[in-house]
Amino acid sequence: MQALQSIIDNAFEQRAEITPDNVEPQVRDAINNVIAQLDSGKLRVAEKINGQWVTHQWLKKAVLLSFRISHNQVIDGSESRYFDKVPMKFANYDQARFEKEGFRVVPPAAVRQGAYIARNTVLMPSYVNIGAYVDEGSMVDTWATVGSCAQIGKNVHLSGGVGIGGVLEPLQANPTIIEDNCFIGARSEIVEGVIVEEGSVISMGVYIGQSTKIYDRETGEIHYGRVPAGSVVVSGNLPSKDGRYSLYCAVIVKKVDAKTRGKVGINELLRTID
């Protein structure tokens, strides 16, 4: 693995000069190897090690390099035709392989090669970009988008129209992460490498980036870039220092543990926020 990483790191330093026509075979093979392992889930761009999320920057570099080594080509789909550098993940799947891998894909859901989809996941008409990781038992609902290299945990529900930001455009240092057992409400956006920790509930229409104030109304604490575990979050506003105007923020209205979450439905958690 160290040799593979070295090839990727060195190639990334010369990325501006790499084209599909001049890329060295060793570099092409290394990039394709990484994309295949991301696709199968053997590698992932970020993982939790000793309780902390670690981003493997060299894998992100390989994803970026993959766009340098391929020409656009026609891609056939059931509803249309496409013209892109990245093949679709399911292009060569047959019924036996779908059954073996154990997830559902509802048309016209689109998943790029290099994204991993785990067992018991349901993809409604949605989009999952290259390098993303969607873990077991999760639901990616209609018109939701999982951005490049984003990490989605087990038993996560991404509601209709949710946007989970990627790392490629604009270029971000770390992927957006949604940990296990989270619920992200319809039309919410979580971007710029924000981490939503385990068991959190994000209400409909909440927008969180690195500069968004995440205000805990019980403690008065303000978080940036991280939603603490077990938070129930709604959209809100905080007044300016001079009191002349207010600016958008996300508000943690309560904290719940796994036991409470198991007994109380998501809708009930969001209704009782006064």
Swiss-Prot record:
User: Might you give the EC number(s) for this enzyme?
Assistant: 2.3.1.117
InterPro entries according to UniProt: DapD_Trfase_Hexpep_rpt_fam (IPR005664), Hexapep (IPR001451), Hexapep_transf_CS (IPR018357), THP_succinylTrfase_dom1 (IPR023180), THP_succinylTrfase_N_sf (IPR037133), Trimer_LpxA-like_sf (IPR011004)
A GO CC term? Answer: cytoplasm
Example of a GO MF term = nucleotidyltransferase activity
Record's catalysed reaction(s): (S)-2,3,4,5-tetrahydrodipicolinate + succinyl-CoA + H2O = (S)-2-succinylamino-6-oxoheptanedioate + CoA
Q: Name one Pfam family in it.
A: Hexapep_2
Annotated compartments: Cytoplasm
Source organism superkingdom: Bacteria
Alphabetic keyword roster = Acyltransferase, Amino-acid biosynthesis, Cytoplasm, Diaminopimelate biosynthesis, Lysine biosynthesis, Repeat, Transferase
Xref: Gene3D superfamilies: Hexapeptide repeat proteins, Tetrahydrodipicolinate-N-succinyltransferase, N-terminal domain
Q: Name one GO biological process term.
A: diaminopimelate biosynthetic process
Named in its record, the pathway it takes part in is:
Amino-acid biosynthesis; L-lysine biosynthesis via DAP pathway; LL-2,6-diaminopimelate from (S)-tetrahydrodipicolinate (succinylase route): step 1/3
Q: Does the keyword NADP apply?
A: no
- What family classification does the UniProt entry report for this protein? Belongs to the transferase hexapeptide repeat family.
| NCBIfam families tied to this protein | dapD, PRK11830.1
Q: What is this protein called?
A: 2,3,4,5-tetrahydropyridine-2,6-dicarboxylate N-succinyltransferase
**What lineage is this protein's organism placed in?**
Bacteria, Pseudomonadati, Pseudomonadota, Gammaproteobacteria, Enterobacterales
Report which gene this protein is encoded by.
Answer: dapD
